[in-house]
């Protein structure tokens, strides 16, 4: 049916824009980027979907009824097939090699931090395993196993003694006193001797015997006398050596004094003889 147009007319070889069906059927080459050969545009998909909507709705109703009444394994298979189809549809670009397996979107990540030992299961896993296993074992055995596992999980720290505990503070004190008494009563040769402190612990050096007894005033001049203060630091070997040296000195002095006395006696005796003559 011809329409009356108002305005300038189109050129002779130009088609009118009203024939949308002719444009869809026209397979003229397109200038610019085009879709892949097996890829449908959204308009064609919408038209195809409009045409097949009635048939798909009927089939979908039948499939939904079958899925509701069918086994769960069949439902899972159909869901997986649908997911695979959704993943494959609309994919274009570089493809993986033939023998290369497609990785999951979220691959399992390695656990970071402290992990459970290899043979250790979480409480949730144990409960799931107990529920999944049918009643092959008696209920008494299962209850005992559950109680044992729960007790082992709740225990933290060292276990208490299983036998009777007879220890107490008073018993420990009595045992300790008994041991000390036995140690003192037995006594060795060294322990039988009276325990006394050495002289250098209880006595002051000779030059400090009057320490603190004199007038408490400052000294006007330094004390020229410097006694032997090595008494506090001498070892037994040093004391023995000093005693030997002191004995030798004393013996030498006594010999020298004796010789002088003998000489004086002789002189006195000669004087007496001379005076008597």
Curated annotation (Swiss-Prot):
Residues 1-240 are annotated as: Disordered. It comes from the Eukaryota. Keywords: Acetylation, Phosphoprotein. The modification N-acetylalanine is found at residue 2. The modification Phosphoserine is found at residues 28, 106, 138, 143, 149-150. The keyword Phosphoprotein applies. Residues 108-117 have a biased composition (Pro residues). Residues 60-69, 81-90 have a biased composition (Acidic residues). A motif (GPALPP motif 2) lies at residues 32-37. A motif (GPALPP motif 3) lies at residues 93-98. A motif (GPALPP motif 4) lies at residues 113-118. InterPro entries: DUF3752 (IPR022226), GPAM1-like (IPR046331). It holds the Pfam family DUF3752. Residues 172-196 have a biased composition (Basic and acidic residues). The keyword Phosphoprotein applies. A motif (GPALPP motif 1) lies at residues 7-12. The modification Phosphothreonine is found at residue 147. This is GPALPP motifs-containing protein 1. The lineage of its organism: Eukaryota, Metazoa, Chordata, Craniata, Vertebrata.
């Amino acid at each position: 049916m011809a329409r009356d147009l108002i305005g300038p007319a189109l050129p002779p070889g130009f088609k009118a824009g009203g024939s949308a069906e002719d444009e869809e059927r026209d397979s003229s080459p397109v200038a610019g980027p085009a879709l892949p050969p097996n890829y449908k545009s959204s308009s064609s998909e919408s038209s195809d979907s409009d045409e097949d909507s009635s048939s798909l709705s009927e089939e979908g109703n039948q499939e939904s009824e079958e899925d509701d009444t069918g086994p769960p394994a069949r439902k899972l298979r159909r869901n997986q097939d649908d997911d695979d189809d959704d993943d494959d549809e609309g994919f274009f670009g570089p493809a993986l090699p033939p023998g290369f397996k497609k990785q999951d979107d979220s691959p399992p990540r390695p656990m970071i931090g402290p992990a459970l030992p290899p043979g250790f299961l979480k409480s949730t896993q144990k409960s799931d395993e107990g529920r999944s296993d049918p009643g092959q074992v008696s209920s008494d055995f299962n209850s005992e196993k559950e109680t044992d596992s729960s007790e082992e999980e709740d225990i933290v720290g060292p276990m208490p003694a299983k036998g009777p505990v007879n220890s107490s503070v008073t018993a420990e004190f009595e045992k300790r006193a008994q041991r000390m008494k036995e140690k003192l009563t037995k006594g060795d040769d060294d322990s039988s001797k009276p325990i006394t402190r050495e002289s250098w612990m209880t006595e002051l050096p000779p030059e400090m015997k009057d320490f603190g007894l004199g007038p408490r005033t400052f000294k006007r001049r330094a004390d020229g006398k410097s006694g032997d203060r090595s008494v506090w630091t001498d070892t037994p070997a040093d004391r023995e050596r000093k005693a030997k040296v002191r004995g030798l000195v004393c013996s030498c002095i006594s010999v020298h004094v004796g010789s002088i006395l003998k000489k004086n006696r002789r002189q006195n005796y000669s004087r007496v003889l001379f005076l008597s003559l």
